[in-house]
Amino acid sequence: MKMEANELSKIYGEGENRVTALDRASFQIMPGDFISITGPSGSGKSTLLHLLSGLDQPTSGRLTYDGQDIYSLSDRERSALRRRSIGFVFQQFHLLPVLTARENILMPLLLDKKQPNEAYLEQLTQLLGIGSRLTHLPHELSGGQQQRVAIARALIAQPDVIFADEPTGNLDSRSGGEVMEMLRAIHEKMEKTLVIITHDNRMAQMADRRFSIVDGILTEVGGR
């Protein structure tokens, strides 16, 4: 899925309280891109992710998915598009404590009243190294394993794009490195578009395209 932002802006407040969180960003995300976005706290990184994923509306500008202006859709249509096309990974794992790893992974399908593809589930969990942990509850898993479960949950509906907001921020250096390698493997082996917001320079350097955002201004700064 091709994503294209044109003069995308987000402004909060008015008058002296006016804050430009994103200032006229224009860029494309092509199918299969691996993109990292870095910047200081409060620079607009999360605002950009929320706009790109349709979780928030811009003050001005346009965002299209394969030519479709997503902000011309109703909230219900945009929500359905997110469920079908986008997976999310966050710093917090957001696993339901009373459900097993398998049940947590399958939750998006259950909410959408879809049956799981068992072959795909096995491929996904083996790739992430959690195939033997599917009957475990979250508290029985390490932090790194819990994040792998969260990644599998983001991928179970086979979305086109994965948005990851500080996916290693809650992990120690070793577990964070393992999660980084797994995200790269998913990008390469499953040909998923991957957009990562990170403070981790190691992860940023792994991306094919690197962006920096400072005071709401987005700049492409390089790539591999």
For each feature predicted by the language model, list its residue ranges:
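ABC family nucleotide-binding domain
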Residues: K2-I213
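H-loop (His-switch) and adjacent beta-strand-loop-beta switch element
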Residues: R210-G222
